[in-house]
């Protein structure tokens, strides 16, 4: 039944019930996926056809990345948004793992318990370089936040001891 439907081809990057990797073989009885950890996963086609499949290689090769970054309360929102866009732009100029198909963007999305959260959106050139793109952006965020004095929160716990 899987071969009649063909939801993916060899070489496509897919997620089948949360298992992510590149399809290396589609046979009559099973499908083989090479995971990001370089492990070969064999999945029976009966299991594949009865589960949700996400094909990251269709309809386009690029992959939209959504990343949440938290900053401390009291941070200048305009400065944070500008700095995050500058970080993505700098990473895109210095690495070949990005796509220009969707313009990078930043949104202030949440007042969280200990941070103001922003979502950055950018495109990796393909699923195979998604982590490389995230790494490049994160390194630039750290560099720019340090230069501009923007602080990222970390979990803290205050313990008060009662007097006996």
PLM feature spans:
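Solvent-exposed, non-transmembrane regulatory segments of membrane-associated proteins
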Residues: 71, 75, 79, 85, ...
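Soluble accessory domains appended to multi-pass membrane transport proteins
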Residues: 1-100
């Amino acid at each position: 039944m899987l071969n009649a439907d063909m939801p993916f081809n060899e070489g496509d990057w897919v997620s089948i019930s949360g298992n992510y990797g590149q399809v290396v073989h589609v046979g009559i009885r099973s499908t083989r996926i090479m995971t990001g950890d370089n492990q070969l996963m064999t999945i029976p086609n009966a299991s594949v056809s009865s589960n949700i499949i996400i094909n990251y290689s269709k309809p386009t090769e690029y992959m939209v990345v959504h990343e949440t970054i938290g900053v401390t309360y009291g941070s200048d929102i305009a400065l944070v948004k500008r700095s995050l866009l500058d970080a993505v732009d700098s990473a895109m100029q210095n690495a070949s793992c990005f796509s220009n198909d969707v313009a990078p963007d930043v949104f202030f999305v949440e007042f969280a318990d200990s941070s103001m959260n922003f979502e950055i959106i950018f495109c990796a050139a393909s699923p195979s370089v998604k982590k490389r793109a995230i790494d490049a952006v994160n390194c630039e965020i750290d560099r720019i936040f340090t230069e501009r004095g923007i602080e990222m929160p970390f979990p803290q716990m205050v313990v008060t001891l009662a007097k006996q």
